[in-house]
């Protein structure tokens, strides 16, 4: 064979071999796809059959008491994982709006308000991310809420450059934790101590005085809102659960932020999802008592309701901007008239207290408070069994019905002030704990609300939301902190007598926030102490006084006139029970999600016991809801995402150990 012919033959042979390889590959891929399709089809058929058998009784109903995240998540699990009919799911809420502590409301004219802000975490919110990966985004077609949040967060990474600021206005070097060997030893000893040995102990009972002067304590305390007298038990849980964040606590890189406030970004899409399936929302309806069947078990037989004035609560009254219609109606009421934009608010500060404009401002905030169903501390509380414009009703449960209750809410009894008015301190018995206390006396194993809700002077702190026309103040804060809005997370003034911190979120933070309006949020932990510059306790301060105290700590008081003229409103919010879930307690004070002996009853909140997990998080609410649904309905074809054991990860622990010696 000639050399040329051989080469041609070789080429032909290679082509034939290539054809065979491609054919074999194609056959393999087709076979694989077919097998995968058959596997998935069989799996879907099995799941569908399971669901049909599971929900053979279409008359069963589920009643959620409380309209917070836990109940909304529970309803979603019923629909998604139990094939439950939406019309058989009933969410009963005592307030006029759903969402619980996940709030966000206001307008450019009256000012915006968030009682609090939630810092999510990509590494530890296992069930939260899983659930919201199946909830459609309202902003992006074919995207989930999880994708929307994580995409936003990855494009707006957090890296605080001014985590702590001292009284001289200097940014503190927080590259070191500030521990001495005694601090390290006490911390290590705590990590090794069984939870059962920490009943009713406080943080300050465990650690020496030096520990509370360390950079670590200031950062850890203000990131999670601990007090020295908070539960040592919960502090240990946080150390175990958030050990992954220990080594980067000074930059807060682990903070995951939502595109908007959590009502707009979390509650609203979840609510819209549930509405699409016909879930029944009963707002402005207070549950006053539960009846149980006689005997040793725990079986709810009846739910006692007190309905308030009728509210037309449907998709039309809850706009896509996350503000209910009561506030929408306020949007034409400006805090400052357009004709007065040239006048500085600082020139109006010394007005007579009886000035009509001031009354107008207070009236606006009063309407905002009503829309959020927040009292001013003088109105008759909903916990006083007021019968005006209300009617009593009893729902009798059938044998297959279930009752799932949110036992306690940290934002109960919250009150608002405004630029000229301090919020009142409402230490009356909160609505959620009142019901919990009633039922805890009827059956064993339902926990005890007293350790959490009997000490409002210890469990309170105060937040404030500042709304500005333009970005003058935000630009000064940006120059001071070296962080653009949305990149710095928390900035704490460590020497502040109120222990004040602020957060400047990416703008806009509300869906109905115009581009020429900016907002930021802050809070103080020690509300009973006089300010460093304003000689009165934070809880007695107006929004203006809180802002001026802040300007002193920012060393911007010389820019006061320039800044104040652009302020639309500063709305302080006093929350008497906001730290109640951190109170020292016994192991038995928090009930199990599904108490022992329960046949149709579960409790879901920040006040139930979930081993290894930490309270004061969105994850805790979602995990509690999933446990309740999967247990009561015997869901076996899906698993609850376990708590990720970073405290047992050698690499994470080594990193944390190294950090503790810096």
Regions found by a protein language model. Give the residues of each.
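Extreme N-terminal leader/targeting segments of oxidoreductases
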Residues: 2-62, 80-86, 321, 655-661
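Glycine-rich Rossmann-fold phosphate-binding loop(s) that bind the pyrophosphate
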Residues: 66-68
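Glycine-rich FAD pyrophosphate-binding loop
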Residues: 79-105
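Conserved FAD-binding subdomain of flavin-dependent enzymes
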Residues: 110-149
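Rossmann-like flavin
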Residues: 138-241
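Helical element adjacent to the flavin cofactor pocket in flavoenzyme catalytic cores
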Residues: 242-326, 372-373, 378, 384-401
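C-terminal segments that line or cap access tunnels to active or ligand-binding sites in enzymes
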Residues: 243-258, 378, 396, 400-624, ...
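Active-site-proximal substrate-binding core of FAD-dependent oxidoreductases
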Residues: 633-662
């Amino acid at each position: 064979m000639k050399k040329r012919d051989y080469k041609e033959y070789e080429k032909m042979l290679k082509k034939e071999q290539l054809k065979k390889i491609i054919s074999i590959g194609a056959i393999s891929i087709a076979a694989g796809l077919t097998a995968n399709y058959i596997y998935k089809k069989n799996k879907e058929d099995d799941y569908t059959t399971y669901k049909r058998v599971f929900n053979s009784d279409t008359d069963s109903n589920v009643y959620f008491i409380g309209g917070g995240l836990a109940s909304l998540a529970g309803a979603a699990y019923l629909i998604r994982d139990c094939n439950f009919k939406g019309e058989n799911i009933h969410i009963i809420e005592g307030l006029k709006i759903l969402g619980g502590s996940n709030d966000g409301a206001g307008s450019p004219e009256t000012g915006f308000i968030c009682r609090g802000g939630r810092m999510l975490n990509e590494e530890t919110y296992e069930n939260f991310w899983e659930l919201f990966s199946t909830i459609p985004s309202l902003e992006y077609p074919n995207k989930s809420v999880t994708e929307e949040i994580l995409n936003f967060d990855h494009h707006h990474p957090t890296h605080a450059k001014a985590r702590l600021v001292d009284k001289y206005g200097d940014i503190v070097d927080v590259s070191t934790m500030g521990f001495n060997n005694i601090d390290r030893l006490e911390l290590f000893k705590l990590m090794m101590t069984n939870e059962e040995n920490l009943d009713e102990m406080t943080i300050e009972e465990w650690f020496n005085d030096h520990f509370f002067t360390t950079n670590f304590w200031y950062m850890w305390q203000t990131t999670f809102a601990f007090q020295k007298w908070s539960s040592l038990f919960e502090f240990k849980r946080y150390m175990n659960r958030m050990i992954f964040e220990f080594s980067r606590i000074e930059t807060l890189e682990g903070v995951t932020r939502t595109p908007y406030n959590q009502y707009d970004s979390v509650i609203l899409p979840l609510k819209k999802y549930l509405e699409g399936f016909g879930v029944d929302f009963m707002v402005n309806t207070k549950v006053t008592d539960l009846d149980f069947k006689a005997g040793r078990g725990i079986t709810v037989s009846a739910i006692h309701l007190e309905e308030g004035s009728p509210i037309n609560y449907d998709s039309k009254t809850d706009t896509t901007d996350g503000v209910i219609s009561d506030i929408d109606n306020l949007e034409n009421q400006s805090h400052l008239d357009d004709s007065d934009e040239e006048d500085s608010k600082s020139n109006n500060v010394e007005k007579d207290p009886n000035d009509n404009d001031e009354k107008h401002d207070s009236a606006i905030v009063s309407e905002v408070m009503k829309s959020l169903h927040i009292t001013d501390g003088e109105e008759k509380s909903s916990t006083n069994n007021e019968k005006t414009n209300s009617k009593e009703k009893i729902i009798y449960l059938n044998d297959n019905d279930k009752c799932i209750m949110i036992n306690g809410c940290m934002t109960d009894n919250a009150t608002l002030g405004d630029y000229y008015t301090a919020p009142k301190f409402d230490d009356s018995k909160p609505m959620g704990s009142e019901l919990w206390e009633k039922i805890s006396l009827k059956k064993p194993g339902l926990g005890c609300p007293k350790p959490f809700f009997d000490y409002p002077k210890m469990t309170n702190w105060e937040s404030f939301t500042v709304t500005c026309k333009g970005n003058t103040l935000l630009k000064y804060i940006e120059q001071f902190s070296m962080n653009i809005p949305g990149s710095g997370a928390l900035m704490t003034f460590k020497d502040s007598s109120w222990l004040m911190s602020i957060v400047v979120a990416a703008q806009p933070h509300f869906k109905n926030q115009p581009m020429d309006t900016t907002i930021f949020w802050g809070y103080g932990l020690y509300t009973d102490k006089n300010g460093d510059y304003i000689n009165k306790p934070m809880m007695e301060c107006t929004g203006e006084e809180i802002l001026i105290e802040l300007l002193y700590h920012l060393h911007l008081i010389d820019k006061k006139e320039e800044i104040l003229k652009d302020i639309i409103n500063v709305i302080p919010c006093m929350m008497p029970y906001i730290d109640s879930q951190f109170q020292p307690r016994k192991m038995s004070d928090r009930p199990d999600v599904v108490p022992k002996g329960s046949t149709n009853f579960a409790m879901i909140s920040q006040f139930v016991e979930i081993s290894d997990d930490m309270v004061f998080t969105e994850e805790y609410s979602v995990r509690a809801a999933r446990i309740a649904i999967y247990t009561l309905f015997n869901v076996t074809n899906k698993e609850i995402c376990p708590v990720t054991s970073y405290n047992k990860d050698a690499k994470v622990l080594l990193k944390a150990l190294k950090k503790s010696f810096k």
